[in-house]
Amino acid sequence: GAHLVPTKSGDADTYNANSDRTLCALLSELPLEKAVMVTYGGDDSLIAFPRGTQFVDPCPKLATKWNFECKIFKYDVPMFCGKFLLKTSSCYEFVPDPVKVLTKLGKKSIKDVQHLAEIYISLNDSNRALGNYMVVSKLSESVSDRYLYKGDSVHALCALWKHIKSFTALCTLLPRRKG
């Protein structure tokens, strides 16, 4: 008989293998030929169908046939891999969820200045869209929708960008170490 070896988390091909498995499962259970957009990575996916497209809820079959946990969200602004998909006047753009960014900043796992410098580079690269007011305005609306927040978060998002775009400003957010 066949000898099946499970994929180990951390293997070089884990992400690609999970992505392929996700796509196969989605292809088997959803009418993707009707979709206007499909993106997937690892075990996450985002699929957009034209308004009014009818299909059977795929979650029960994805759970039993593919052993996948399935959730269908119907927010005004879609999300993929922790990023909102925002439409500005000129394009679509994936922008990190600022609540998750702040949560990461609150972790106490920063080892030293070198580690902080690496975090700074990553934060700066992935959050560069916060320098665009059109994006910030849409992101504020998205945060309100996703977290049922009634207020406006534009000022908070601008403050977040101020601290992310400058290493010196980022350092002021962190407590000073003794010794």
Curated annotation (Swiss-Prot):
Say which domain of life the source belongs to. Viruses
Q: Which Gene Ontology biological process is one annotated for this entry?
A: DNA-templated transcription
Which molecular function GO terms apply here?
A: ATP binding; ATP hydrolysis activity; RNA binding; RNA helicase activity; RNA-directed RNA polymerase activity
**Reaction equations catalysed:** RNA(n) + a ribonucleoside 5'-triphosphate = RNA(n+1) + diphosphate; ATP + H2O = ADP + phosphate + H(+)
Enzyme nomenclature, EC number: 2.1.1.-, 2.7.7.48, 3.6.4.13
Keyword Transport among record annotations:
no
Q: Does the keyword Nucleotide-binding apply?
A: yes
The alphabetical list of record keywords is:
ATP-binding, Helicase, Hydrolase, Nucleotide-binding, Nucleotidyltransferase, RNA suppression of termination, RNA-directed RNA polymerase, Transferase, Viral RNA replication
The record's similarity note reads: Belongs to the ssRNA positive-strand viruses RNA-directed RNA polymerase family.
Explain the purpose of this protein.
Replicase large subunit: is an RNA-dependent RNA polymerase active in viral RNA replication.
Q: What is this protein called?
A: Replicase large subunit
Give the taxonomic lineage as stored in the record: Viruses, Riboviria, Orthornavirae, Kitrinoviricota, Alsuviricetes
